[in-house]
Swiss-Prot record:
Keywords: Cell membrane, Membrane, Toxin-antitoxin system, Transmembrane, Transmembrane helix. It comes from Bacillus subtilis (strain 168). The keyword Ribosomal protein does not apply. It is a single-pass membrane protein. The chain crosses the membrane at residues 4-24. Induction: Accumulates by 2 hours post-innoculation with maximal expression at 4 hours, and has disappeared by 8 hours in rich media. Slightly different results were found in another study; in rich medium, expression increased slowly over time and was maximal at 6 hours. In minimal medium without glucose expression decreased as growth progressed, while in minimal medium plus glucose expression was constant during growth. SR5 antitoxin RNA is always present at levels equal to or in excess of toxin mRNA. Pfam families: Hol_Tox (PF16935). Disulfide bonds: none annotated. This is Small toxic protein BsrE. Coiled coil: none annotated. It is found in: Cell membrane.
Amino acid sequence: MSTFQALMLMLAIGSFIIALLTYIEKIDLP
């Protein structure tokens, strides 16, 4: 795996985690 592929993978995972956290926060809000 090249460095570029690893970087893109980390970016995709990071974006997914951020989206998941914001989704959970929206659910917790009334």
